[in-house]
């Protein structure tokens, strides 16, 4: 799974189902594909979204700022700074500084995520705040590792509060991952289609998958329900691949 797919999965797992979730998913896809390069407009849009908690807005603002190229002197946004101040708790700030020093030594996404997971959500948010306020720099991979660790902790607490049966991997994250991968596969099918005879069919299947993912994000579904979506899409994709005589990577 690519780094950006993983980041998208984790970030979306903490956003409540509804039309806004589908909209945010689209914005993230556009940002990661380099299609949305107006950071100022993006942040203004994010600031005025309803429903989202200040921390979720802070995390999204941090991700957008990391990903969208911007002029050096671009002003930092107050709503992101306030969300990433660790509730003003000096203990969170102390821990954030310790974590930041460790993250400086971690250059990989997984290494950074592993280190960050042993800290509290408040300390993780404060550490993001340090980086956001340009008080320190880490690699982009390290910063994304920090983001995903924070989202995993939030999703874990949401999952516990949902009183769902615990499994080895958080079902909310797994569910979101299936939907992100279904979208990615749909995109790949469209690219593969080209001008072949089956192009219309491939586009149709991809379009159906995309609409299904959007509908699931909008109305909200049980974490197990996306397994069926994944299986249907895989079936369609494999049948299409057979005819095209190509192989694509499976996803779970």
From Swiss-Prot:
Domain of life according to the entry: Viruses
Family of this protein: Belongs to the influenza viruses Matrix protein M1 family.
Gene Ontology BP terms: viral budding from plasma membrane
Membrane topology: Peripheral membrane protein
Keywords: Host nucleus, Membrane, RNA-binding, Viral matrix protein, Virion
Protein name: Matrix protein 1
Note from the entry: Most abundant protein in virion. When expressed alone can form virus-like particles in transfected cells.
Region named Membrane-binding: 1-164
Xref: HAMAP family: INFV_M1
Gene that produces this protein: M
SUPFAM superfamilies referenced in this protein's UniProt entry, alphabetically: Influenza virus matrix protein M1 (SSF48145)
Span list, region RNP-binding: 165-252
Purpose of the protein: Plays critical roles in virus replication, from virus entry and uncoating to assembly and budding of the virus particle. M1 binding to ribonucleocapsids (RNPs) in nucleus seems to inhibit viral transcription. Interaction of viral NEP with M1-RNP is thought to promote nuclear export of the complex, which is targeted to the virion assembly site at the apical plasma membrane in polarized epithelial cells. Interactions with NA and HA may bring M1, a non-raft-associated protein, into lipid rafts. Forms a continuous shell on the inner side of the lipid bilayer in virion, where it binds the RNP.
Organism this protein belongs to: Influenza A virus (strain A/Chicken/Hong Kong/715.5/2001 H5N1 genotype E)
Self-association and partners: Homodimer and homomultimer. Interacts with NEP. Binds ribonucleocapsid by both interacting with genomic RNA and NP protein. May interact with HA and NA. Cannot bind NP without genomic RNA.
């Amino acid at each position: 799974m690519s780094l950006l797919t993983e980041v998208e999965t984790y970030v979306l797992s903490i956003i409540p189902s509804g039309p806004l979730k589908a909209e945010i998913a689209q914005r993230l896809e556009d940002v990661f594909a380099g299609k949305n390069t107006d950071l100022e407009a993006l942040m203004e849009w994010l600031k005025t979204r309803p429903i989202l908690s200040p921390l979720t807005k802070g995390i999204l603002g941090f991700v957008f700022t990391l990903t969208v190229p911007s002029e050096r002197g671009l002003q930092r946004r107050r709503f992101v700074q306030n969300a990433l101040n660790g509730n003003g708790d000096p203990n969170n700030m102390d821990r954030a500084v310790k974590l930041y020093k460790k993250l400086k030594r971690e250059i990989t996404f997984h290494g950074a995520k592993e280190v960050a997971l042993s800290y509290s959500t408040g300390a993780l948010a404060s550490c993001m705040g340090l980086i956001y306020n340009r008080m320190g720099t880490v690699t982009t991979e390290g910063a994304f590792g920090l983001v995903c660790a924070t989202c995993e902790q939030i999703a874990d607490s949401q999952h516990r509060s949902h009183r769902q049966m615990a499994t080895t991997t958080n079902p909310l994250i797994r569910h979101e991952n299936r939907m992100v991968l279904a979208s990615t596969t749909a995109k790949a099918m469209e690219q593969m289609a080209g001008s072949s005879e089956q192009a219309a069919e491939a586009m149709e299947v991809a379009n159906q998958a995309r609409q299904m993912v959007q509908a699931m994000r909008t109305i909200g579904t049980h974490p197990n329900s996306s397994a069926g979506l994944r299986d249907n899409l895989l079936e369609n994709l494999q049948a299409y691949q057979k005819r095209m005589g190509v192989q694509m990577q499976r996803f779970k």
